[in-house]
Amino acid sequence: MSNSNDNIWNNTEELNELLRIRREKLNILRSMGIEPYGIDRFERTNLSSDIKNDYENFEGKVVTLAGRIMSKRSHGKASFADIQDRDGRIQIYVKYDTVGEKNYEIFKILDIGDIIGVTGEVFKSKTGEITIRVTDFKLLSKSLQILPEKWHGLKDPDLRYRQRYTDLIINPEVKEVFLKRTKIIKAIREFLDNRGFLEVETPILHTIAGGAAARPFITHHNALDIDMYLRIALELHLKRLIVGGLEKVYEMGRVFRNEGMDIRHNPEFTLLELYEAYTDYYGMMELTEQLFAYVAQKVNGITKIVYQGTEIDLTPPWKRITMVDAIKEYVGVDFNEVKTDEEAIEIAKKLNLETKEGMKKGEVIALVFDELVEQHLIQPTFVMDYPVEISPLAKRKHDNPAFTSRFEAFIYGREVANAFSELNDPIDQKERFLEQLKQREAGDEEAHMMDEDFINALEVGMPPTGGLGIGVDRLVMFMTDAYSIRDVILFPTMKPKND
C-alpha cells in the first residue's frame, strides 16, 4: 500500500502543516454537529475475519463493524476505503446516493487513521474483493497524528519500540508475534498445570536481593524507612514454599536486573521458575525438553523451528554433555587434568582470555566455556555439572564436589534454561553465602547477599528438590524467529528521547 504521506517524514514543515489541517478538520466536524469523541459505546455484529472466512454465509447480509481507516480512495460521488480491526482489514464502499449528501461530505473529511463504525451489506466488488456497501457510518475517534507509511516511516526500530501502538497498527506481523507470545505463555501454564504444578505469586519487593548473580534496582519504602530491591529472581521464596510442603510450584513473572541492554537482555523481563520436590536435575532435563517440545507443537504445530535461517529440532531427547567435556570437545583443553587455580589461569591467558586476580579454577572453566564454547551449541544441548564457584545455590556432586548438579540448556548458542539439584544442606549453603559475601566486599556487586531467613527455612528441612528457570522472552524469540528481545517485549526499556 502506498499513501500520500510517503515522503512527508523528511519534511518537518509539510508534516506540521498536515497536522494543522487535521486539527482544523476537527473544528469543521464540530461545526457540522459531529463530536469526534462523543460516542461511548458502539455495538458490532462481527469482526472482519468472520466475513472474510465465511463469505458465502454473509453475502447479502447486513453487518456492523468498526475499525481504523487505513486507506481511502475517492471517485467523485463514491469512495472506497479499507478499515482495520483486531483481525485484519476489509474494504468498505461509501456512495453519495446511499448515505446522503451530509454524510458523504463528512466521510470525505475523514482521514487515514480515523476510527469509524459502519453498517452495510456484504458483497464482492467488480475486482472480486469482499466489501461492505455502507448504509450508515459513525465517527468514533478522530486521529490527529499522521500514520507512517509501512516501509518508510516505521523501518526505524527505535521509533517502532518507542511507538509500539503505531507499530501494531502498521505492521500486522508485529501483532502476530505478540498474539503468539500469549499462546506460548498459555501453553507453558497448560503444560505445568497438567503435571500438577501449583502457580503461585511471591513478592516483587525484597529486603534482600537473592536467587541470581545480578545487580538489583534499589528503591525506598517510606513507611518502613528501609531500602528494598526489585526482585532479580523468584528462587528463594519458591524454595520456602517447597519447605512448606507445596512440593510442585511455579511462578511466571517480571524480574528486574540493573544491567546492560542488548539483543538478548532487557532490564525487566519475564522469568519462569519452577520447583519440584523429590526429583533432581535429571528430572528437570526431562521436563525442560518436554516443555519446549510441547510449546512448539501447541503454538507452531511442529517440534522443529527455523531460527534466523537455521533449523532447530526440539524433539526430545536433547544432547547432554558436561561443561568440562564441552570445553575438551571445542577448545581441546581437558580441565580434569588441571590441578591448581594458577595452572587454570595460565591456560586462560594462552587462550587470550582476560582473567581477574584471584580467580578460582571453576571460574576459569566457566570463562573458557562462555567465551569459546557457547556459540557452537546450535542444536538443543544440556551442558551439565557446573563449577561450585559459580553455582552457590546448587547441590554438589557427591562423586566430584568441585562441581554441582546443575545444567544450562543452550539453543543457537544461547542459554535458554538453568536448573539445579537444589542445595538443601543449610550448613553448606551458609558457607557459600559467606564466600559470596567476601566477593561482595571485594567489589563484586552481583555476588549474593546473606539471607538468614532462607538458611532458617533450610534448617527446618527441604526435601531433595529439582529447580528450573527459563527466560520466557528468549523462548518467545525462538518460537517467533525474532532477532532481538525487544521484538518480543511490547514496551522494551528505552533511553528517554531528548526533547
Swiss-Prot record:
Record InterPro entries: Aa-tRNA-synt_II, aa-tRNA-synth_II, aa-tRNA-synth_II/BPL/LPL, Lys-tRNA-ligase_II, Lys-tRNA-ligase_II_bac/euk, Lys-tRNA-ligase_II_N, Lys-tRNA-synth_II_C, NA-bd_OB-fold
Instruction: Name the keywords, alphabetized.
Output: Aminoacyl-tRNA synthetase, ATP-binding, Cytoplasm, Ligase, Magnesium, Metal-binding, Nucleotide-binding, Protein biosynthesis
* Co-factor requirement: Mg(2+)
Q: Write down the EC number.
A: 6.1.1.6
Specify where it is mainly localized.
cytoplasm
What NCBIfam families does UniProt report for this protein, alphabetically? lysS_bact, PRK00484.1
Protein name stated in the entry: Lysine--tRNA ligase
Task: Point out the gene that encodes the protein.
Answer: lysS
